[in-house]
Amino acid sequence: MGTPELKIILEFSAGAELLFGNIKRRELNLDGKQKWTIANLLKWMHANILTERPELFLQGDTVRPGILVLINDTDWELLGELDYELQPNDNVLFISTLHGG
């Protein structure tokens, strides 16, 4: 029997995808033996898929102001933000509200 996996979908919109190799959607198979919170996911994203200007996406251990995070179409602030524990087939959407003028 194989290692358990946690399958989730990451989506990036409104310019956030530019920081992640211009890829708008990624299906991930994370190690299912560990507990995955949004905090852990952000660290994984920084180490593995954040390709451009991390200061535009992260501020300390969280997303910077101006990045909206929706989990299954619900504002992450209603779900515990960094402490939210990811569930199988969760859809995590990052939307940038930071636009140049």
Curated annotation (Swiss-Prot):
Pathway(s) per entry: tRNA modification; 5-methoxycarbonylmethyl-2-thiouridine-tRNA biosynthesis
Reported modifications of this chain: C-terminal thiocarboxylation occurs in 2 steps, it is first acyl-adenylated (-COAMP) via the hesA/moeB/thiF part of the MOCS3 homolog, then thiocarboxylated (-COSH) via the rhodanese domain of the MOCS3 homolog.
Places the protein is found: Cytoplasm
Location (main, coarse): cytoplasm
Gene3D superfamilies (UniProt xref): 3.10.20.30
GO molecular function (one): protein tag activity
GO cellular component, one term: cytosol
Sequence similarity: Belongs to the URM1 family.
Function (record text): Acts as a sulfur carrier required for 2-thiolation of mcm(5)S(2)U at tRNA wobble positions of cytosolic tRNA(Lys), tRNA(Glu) and tRNA(Gln). Serves as sulfur donor in tRNA 2-thiolation reaction by being thiocarboxylated (-COSH) at its C-terminus by MOCS3. The sulfur is then transferred to tRNA to form 2-thiolation of mcm(5)S(2)U. Also acts as a ubiquitin-like protein (UBL) that is covalently conjugated via an isopeptide bond to lysine residues of target proteins such as Prx2/Jafrac1, Ciao1, Eip71CD and GILT1.
Subunit structure: Interacts with cer.
UniProt-recorded name of the protein: Ubiquitin-related modifier 1 homolog
Gene name tied to this protein: Urm1
